Structure formats: C-alpha cells, structure tokens
C-alpha cells in the first residue's frame, strides 16, 4: 500500500476524539445559568489574607510589590480606582 492509502485507512479507523459529539459541554458550550452559578460561587469564597511583607499598601485591598508603584487605573472598567503601575 502507498503511504497516502495507509494514512486514509488510519484516519478511518480512529474514533472521534473525546468531547466531540458525546454530549459533554466543553468551553463555550456551557449553559449561561451554569456559568452564572459558578461565578457567584467564586465570589462567595472567603477572601485570602494578604501578605503585606515586601510591598507598599496602595488601598484597602491592594498591595503593590517593589517593582510597581501605586497609582490610579486608566482601564475603562476600573477607571480611577487604586492600581499597581509598572511605569
């Protein structure tokens, strides 16, 4: 058999990859209400205690490491809030 024929034979014998057509949601296939529940569950987790060793306090819940400086965010969603800036 030629190489091309062997390759086609192998491709015909290989089953579908897992996740393809087996009914399981992957990535973008997730139900929006399921994603919302997961996000709310994430928000309800207790906050971790901040380790302020070796950093500069830059707001009530923000601590900048030594290579960054305190400033205000220019991002459209967090404009004017405290932020760690690299310049």
From Swiss-Prot:
Predominant localisation class: secreted
Key words, A-Z: Disulfide bond, Knottin, Secreted, Signal, Toxin
Cell compartment(s), UniProt: Secreted
Keyword Signal part of the UniProt annotation: yes
The keyword ATP-binding belongs to this UniProt entry's keyword annotation: no
Disulfide topology: 55-64, 58-70, 63-84
One MF term in the entry's GO annotations: toxin activity
GO CC terms, sorted: extracellular region
Residues of the signal peptide: 1-19
Propeptide position ranges: 20-52
Tissue expression profile of the protein: Expressed by the venom duct.
Homology family: Belongs to the conotoxin Q superfamily.
Domain note: The presence of a 'disulfide through disulfide knot' structurally defines this protein as a knottin.
Protein name: Conotoxin Ca6.2
Organism: Conus caracteristicus (Characteristic cone)
Lineage, highest ranks first: Eukaryota, Metazoa, Spiralia, Lophotrochozoa, Mollusca
């Amino acid at each position: 058999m030629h190489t091309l024929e062997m390759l086609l034979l192998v491709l015909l014998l290989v089953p579908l990859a897992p996740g393809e057509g087996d009914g399981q949601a992957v990535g973008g296939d997730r139900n929006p209400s399921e994603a919302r529940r997961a996000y709310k569950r994430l928000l309800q987790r207790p906050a971790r205690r901040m380790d302020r060793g070796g950093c500069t306090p830059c707001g009530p819940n923000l601590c900048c490491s030594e290579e960054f400086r305190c400033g205000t965010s220019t991002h459209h969603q967090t404009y004017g809030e405290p932020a760690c800036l690299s310049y």
